[in-house]
A protein has these predicted regions:
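Short helix-capping and inter-helix turn/linker motifs at the boundaries of alpha-helical repeat units
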Residues: 119, 291, 309-310, 323-327, ...
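Carbohydrate-binding/catalytic loop surfaces
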Residues: 310-324, 363-383, 387, 391, ...
């Protein structure tokens, strides 16, 4: 699995093409393929101090210069205030992503391959250099740009204050703002040269400028590292950086970290090789040989992280800023864990959310601060039933059923019981068996934008996808109670009532599709109705299902996602850019969402027949996603896209449910029926 990109010395058109790596703890690394930083949330080591939250930028990047004779080649790419930038991109011959990052530079007679990798399960970044010199002796000057800030904030000279401890082959930094941790950086050789100017400031992140915020950062640079490159030599050089509790830096610990690297200058390369082996193992476990499925499998892994508070794994909703959201986790769950053969992760994720079930609700989100979870969602608990159903469908062993019966089934029964009686956020079952949710300022469906007292998409009443999920949950419970010998036909009886009421209340003869919300009937054409066709248990006849899919195709499908609103609607806002207020107006009012492709493709295949011809058509519908993997975040899928052409990727540059749902629908509904796998 490899992406190779030629940049052609074009900084402006490549600055928004980004990359990301993750460490399985919620920590990550990221940058632009130009070598510059494009967002506040980027750097070579953004560590999670309390997995998977409390994320801090510790190591922003490295800049390099080659000095040969009287000539200096500046390989750095940085954008500064006002949009001016250094021109290191002219020396980049290729950018490569294969589970690690590699920039290939050519300057004069010297070729440098600069590899970046993260260790799994540690807050540790490795930068490994392969240097080939076909000419005269030269020097490689490396400037580490250090930092310490919460990953959504920016640094200034005043905020970047450290106690600096120099070692022979490295240094440690103790942040004065949080002196219970220290940052260690070590080099496999070279000479540390103290810099006169210890700060590089006014570093500008273009995406933040697009969003009408300053986007300026500052980095602390106490030393350069000078490495001799003999004439005609080939050599390796390593940098390792981590952040550890302060006690790990006491005494000679920081020096020992540096000495370890010096004694074995392959340490960074060992991390690099370990990450490549890890990526190969992910692919092997998935069983995929199809190129698209393989690439999505590698992307899927980036969202799975350990949660320290539960001791189990969870799913981060999106890179670079989201934490674990219940709704996003349950929607992405099948693609991220089951399609990829990671059944133990699937097991742990179900346990994580069962542990936090409260008043019939599973968490909407876990805040980045690590505080108590928030429960303001009606659909996360209902998507949980879908995840359980899929877990049993894929794993299908006696142990799997026993696990669900013992650890999950009580939670499921509590959810059904509580929804029937009523719970927080005006969530309750009405006399017609349908679920009502939301009131006032509460936003409890996925269309949840609220700014102060302004609610963009209130959707109070009985939303269409909530009641499709409710019916699916009741049918799932009926299946489970029969399997577990409960002899309880109440779920089946209630499901029958829901089916009758749903068909009576939601079908809109005027539009030939479903209302988005009843009882205050909202005939706005939105994508939520697709789940009334795509879920395992559904309520509509074939003619109505086909009409829904045709309407969604005609009005909402845009290649990499479905529009959140009919473009003919007066409130349609297709472009997600500018200030927060401008973006909030577009978020669910025209912006297209990648995750919705999953339900749409499944519904499309269902209504058109599971044939080779249908699979080929569905496969073609996914071609824009294949192209997208080479843009925005290389190898992954954005959270959202502009509703109007050219449908630029926006929001999180890598989103769990976008990746998970595209992978799920592809491996369930398309790939099995293709005449041959893509190579």
């Amino acid at each position: 699995m490899q992406f190779n990109i030629k940049l052609q010395n074009d900084f402006k058109n490549n600055i928004r093409r980004e990359w990301a790596l993750t460490n399985g703890l919620g920590g990550y690394a990221g940058g632009s393929v130009t070598g510059a930083i494009n967002r506040t949330h980027q750097g070579y080591l953004i560590a999670s101090l309390h997995a998977p939250v409390q994320r801090y930028v510790c190591f922003s990047k490295t800049n390099e210069k080659i000095v040969t004779g009287s000539h200096t080649y500046d390989l750095s790419s940085d954008q500064f205030k006002g949009g001016c930038h250094t021109d290191g991109i002219q020396y980049i011959r290729e950018f490569t992503y294969d589970g690690t990052i590699c920039f290939t530079y050519e300057a004069g007679d010297i070729t440098i391959k600069k590899h970046i990798a993260l260790a799994q399960g540690k807050n540790l970044a490795a930068v490994a250099y392969e240097v080939q010199n076909k000419g005269e002796a030269a020097k490689l000057l490396i400037t580490p740009l250090m930092n310490f800030r919460e990953h959504s904030e920016s640094s200034t000279v005043d905020s970047l204050k450290f106690e600096v401890q120099k070692q022979e082959h490295g240094f440690t930094l103790i942040p004065k703002a949080q002196d219970d941790h220290c940052i260690r950086i070590a080099f496999s050789g070279g000479e540390l040269i103290e810099r006169d100017d210890k700060y590089i400031c006014d570093l500008e992140a273009q995406t933040e400028v697009d969003n009408e915020v300053p986007g300026l950062d500052c980095a602390f640079c106490p030393y350069d590292v000078s490495v001799d490159i003999p004439a005609g030599a080939s050599m390796h050089f390593s940098i390792m950086c981590d952040i550890v509790p302060l006690e790990a830096c006491n005494g000679n610990a920081g020096s020992a970290f540096a000495k370890h690297l010096v004694s074995d200058n392959e340490s960074a390369f060992e991390i690099l090789r370990a990450q490549l082996d890890y990526t190969d193992e992910l692919i092997k476990r998935s069983g995929f040989i199809d190129d698209f499925a393989v690439k999505l499998t590698v992307a899927a892994n980036q969202f799975i992280a350990h949660r320290q508070s539960t001791g189990y794994d969870t799913v981060l909703a999106g890179l670079p800023w989201f934490t674990d959201w219940g709704r996003d986790t349950m929607i992405s769950y099948t693609g991220l864990t089951l399609c990829t053969g990671r059944f133990e992760k699937a097991h742990d994720i179900l346990l994580t959310f069962a542990k936090y079930c409260k008043d019939g609700l599973i968490p909407n989100m876990f805040p980045d601060s690590g505080l108590k979870p928030l429960y303001n969602t009606v659909d996360a608990s209902l998507w949980y039933f879908y995840a359980v159903y899929k877990y049993l469908e894929y794993v299908n062993t006696p142990d799997a059923y026993e696990f669900i019966k013992k650890d999950i089934y009580p939670c499921l029964k509590d959810i059904i019981s509580t929804y029937k009686k009523g719970t927080d956020f005006s969530i309750y079952m009405d006399t017609d068996g349908l679920i009502h949710a939301g009131s006032g300022l509460d936003q409890v469906t996925w269309m949840d934008v609220r700014v102060g007292d302004w609610v963009a998409t209130p959707r109070h009443g009985k939303p269409v996808e909530i009641n499709a999920l409710w019916y699916n949950a009741l049918c799932t419970m009926d299946m489970l109670q029969a399997k577990f010998g409960d002899n309880d036909d109440s779920y089946r009886q209630l499901a029958s009532l829901v089916k009758t009421s749903f068909n009576k209340r939601f079908w809109n003869e005027n539009t030939g599709c479903l209302y988005d919300v009843v009882d205050e009937d909202d005939d706005t054409i939105r994508p939520n109705q697709i789940y009334a066709v795509s879920l395992p248990f559904t309520m509509l006849d074939k003619e109505r299902e086909k009409a829904i899919v045709d309407t969604v195709m005609d009005k909402l499908y845009v290649g990499c996602g479905l529009r959140s609103l009919d473009p003919d609607h007066k409130d349609y806002h297709p472009i997600y850019i500018g200030s927060l207020s401008k973006r909030d107006h577009a978020y669910h009012q025209g912006t297209a969402w990648g995750f919705l492709l999953g339900g749409f493709i499944s519904a499309y295949v269902k209504v058109n027949g599971r044939t080779k011809a249908t699979a080929l058509c569905a496969d073609k519908l996914l071609d824009p996603v294949r192209e997208h993997l080479l843009n925005n975040c290389i190898g992954s899928i954005c959270e959202i896209f502009d509703g109007d052409a050219p449908h630029n990727g926006r929001g999180c540059y890598a989103q769990a449910w976008s990746v998970g749902e595209v992978l799920r629908c592809y491996c369930e509904d398309v790939l099995p029926m293709l005449p041959q796998a893509h190579s």
